[in-house]
Amino acid sequence: MANSFSWKTKFKSIIIVDGELFANEYSIKLFITPYTANLKEQTEYFDRLKNLFEMVFANTITTWRDDPLYHILQKSSSNRFIELPKPPYDQIMAAVCFCKANAILDSNITVNKLELSSWQGDGITYSVDKDSKELILLDTPNWFSKKYESFDPWWLRADTATYDRELDKGIYTGHFSWNNKIPVDKKHETHAKIFEFNPKVLDGGKNKNK
């Protein structure tokens, strides 16, 4: 039987609530089981998990997709965003983090449970596992247009996207890359293709064509 362990981390993200910006910090505890016997792979995927929270999610603006201020900031700033299908309550954030963490790990490591609390969250800790009802809140029919309706929302994909955007060449797949052979490219959005992109590099990548 695989050995399980837990890991704690934090990241800061500004949240948009009712058209206002609020500083926030999320505290996360993950309960993890590795399923690959290859220690190098375990290390690579754990690095990927660490970078998801400490780099990809960090220093972002977290928002509901339909918030008017989000659309203004998209056009007038160069911030990175975490785009949610509902307003940014901690239950939604916990469910999104749980799904994205498992998506990027390719079943080599499994996050069995995730606990999340936040500075703005009144001291409440939310727990999410595969049977949690919070996951139903992420059900998003018509998230993409008909052209791209076969694609999952960003929190169910293994790329580094934290919001979704349809581009002429395909869907946006993230500011970072798991593939450590891909060079840094500051013009990431103009080069984004469907599961093929040239963004900033993170540890934990494997040589896979996605």
Regions found by a protein language model. Give the residues of each.
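Fungi-biased regulatory scaffold/adaptor regions
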Residues: 2-3, 7-8, 12
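Charged, low-complexity, helix-prone segments enriched in Lys/Glu/Asp/Gln
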Residues: 7-9, 129-131, 166
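Histidine-centered catalytic/metal-coordination loop motif
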Residues: 10-99, 178-210
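Short, surface-exposed ligand- or partner-binding patches at beta-edge/loop junctions that are enriched
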Residues: 104-118
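Short, low-complexity, polybasic intrinsically disordered segments
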Residues: 116-156
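Intrinsic low-complexity, glycine/proline- and repeat-rich
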Residues: 139-210
